[in-house]
Amino acid sequence: MAEQTLSFVDCLMSRFPTVRVSVAQPRGEISLDVPVVEWCAVCKALRDEFDFEQLSDLCGVDYLGYGNAEWDTTDVSAQGFSRGVAGKAVGRFAWGEFPSAGSNDGTQPWDVPQERFAVLAHLISYRHNRRLRVRCFASNDALPIVASLTDVWPGVNWFEREAFDLFGIVFEGHPDLRRILTDYGFIGHPFRKDFPLTGNVEVRYDEEKKRVVYVPVTSVEPRVSVPRVIRDDPRFGAAAGESTHSETVK
């Protein structure tokens, strides 16, 4: 780990004792996992004390099914992927159904989050030429609520609206939290892993009503043509210089 990166990590650990700091090697990419109750306070301190004056991006993440594989590619590849499906995983169910395919058996080399929804922000300090990734998890999967950062970085307004629209994450204190991408009256949040790929409704023109109407999906059958797998394949190995592992400092 570069001396400059190590020094910065030490400063973060000293300033935020309840925050988990991790560094992805060999590039030294620093990430913070912040308790949701401290989300605003930590971000404000990063802006004021560490000169992270710009939030370049904020997004939501749905960890439902994270670390789970749907397909048995070892024994049935020659016979077709559809013969190896075990249960209905993400994308293979209709509206109102729920994924039933396997789970992480604890042998995976990564940590599977206990909470489902996370908010991820990328910060930039131009003064110190640094980038930082900050993440927090909503404590309630049924109604994920995270404090809004609009008072810290006003430009985050539309980013939070997008995360609300696509993931259903409620940003408490946001001045205008409404959908920004989907249509009026849209049902559900399309980037959630339990949102069917077929959607909930389809659009057609009604001759009697002389207008476009929304009706339940009946003409599309849920199917996945690309396998959802987790495997060690050299073709997908990290390029030289890319991050290959993450080291939790604290």
UniProtKB/Swiss-Prot annotation:
It comes from the Bacteria. It is found in: Cell inner membrane. Its EC number is 7.1.1.-. GO terms for cellular component: plasma membrane. One of its GO terms (molecular function) is NADH dehydrogenase (ubiquinone) activity. It is a peripheral membrane protein. It catalyses: a quinone + NADH + 5 H(+)(in) = a quinol + NAD(+) + 4 H(+)(out). Keywords: Cell inner membrane, Cell membrane, Membrane, NAD, Quinone, Translocase, Transport, Ubiquinone. PROSITE patterns: COMPLEX1_30K (PS00542). It is an enzyme of class 7 (translocase). Gene3D superfamilies: NADH:ubiquinone oxidoreductase, 30kDa subunit. Belongs to the complex I 30 kDa subunit family. NDH-1 is composed of 14 different subunits. Subunits NuoB, C, D, E, F, and G constitute the peripheral sector of the complex. NCBIfam families: PRK06074.1-1 (NF004730), PRK06074.1-4 (NF004732). NDH-1 shuttles electrons from NADH, via FMN and iron-sulfur (Fe-S) centers, to quinones in the respiratory chain. The immediate electron acceptor for the enzyme in this species is believed to be ubiquinone. Couples the redox reaction to proton translocation (for every two electrons transferred, four hydrogen ions are translocated across the cytoplasmic membrane), and thus conserves the redox energy in a proton gradient. This is NADH-quinone oxidoreductase subunit C. It comes from Xylella fastidiosa (strain Temecula1 / ATCC 700964).
